[in-house]
Each structure stands twice: as structure tokens, then as C-alpha cells.
């Protein structure tokens, strides 16, 4: 019997993730569904958990939001996002395409709530590639249900403040739910997607 997997992602990512899923060629059925905000993602999980074998969740915070709530069915969950090496490549590709870019003025949104700096310079030079994931994981583990619900608004407000104060030129975004609002404010954004092989490896864990 074929496994059933549900991928939960933001509305913005539903189409590109559906395209990636179509290229996986795995011996399972993967359905891609969307959520609107961290406060409601557990409801989306619950609506599918009774009839699925596992979940792919877009982002560690979204996964933490689900795990912070009690559920009638506890299915295996893995989170997916671009990995650290992929973020490095995305930033280096930006620099190669435009040598005039100032890495001090490119902001990585997911680093805003975490101590250690949120610029591309901080990520590329001050944060060791081998220590970034544990650093983020430790912060994620300390999150509470209340703090999770406020993260996106906090990050969005800080990015708008920085943009209005001319403190940045671009956002490398991983909180995909805030992308429409960032673009409505005219803030240049990029969203690097995880690779097909990365999603395939995670799906095989379920």
C-alpha cells in the first residue's frame, strides 16, 4: 500500500513546492496543502492527520507550532527549508550577479529574532557554516506557543522599520507568509527554495 504524505506550506510556496513534489518520483502519494499563519497550522495538521502516514512541514518554526499543541493523531513530522549550504550559495550567487551589492545591507529574515546579527555579512563571515543549524535549533527548541504566534509580526515590523530607515537593500526571506506584505512595501526580496533532492531525502525519512 502506498504511503500518504501531506506537505504543509504557506500559500505563497504551494505552487513551487507542488512543482518540486511532481519531480520526486517516489513510491508514495504527496498532497500539498497550505496554511495562513502559525496560529492556524495545527488545525491544518489535524484535518489531515487521521488519514496520512507523515508530514513534510515548511520550516522549523511551523513544525514547532504544530508540536506545541496536543493532537488526536501524532504522525511523523519533518521540516523542510533550504539548508545552510544552499543559503550560502544563494548569497554568493547574488554577489556574483551584482558585485556592487553590500552584504551588510542584505538581511536574512530568519536571523532577526536570534542573537548574532541578521545581515548577510554576519551569516557569511561571523557565523560558521557548521554551527548555524545548531544555533538555530537551540533557539527553536526554546520557543513557546505564545512566542511562536508573534514571530512573523515581529520580523515583518522590524524589516519594514529597517527599510523605512534606509538600513537595508534586500531581504533573503524564509518566512514566506510575510512575502506579500514585504513586496507591498516595495521591499526587494528573494526566496531560495530547497532542492528536489533535499525534499526527496526528507520524504524518504517518513
PLM regions: where:
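Alpha-helical/coil-rich non-catalytic "connector" segments in signaling and regulatory proteins
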Residues: 1-206
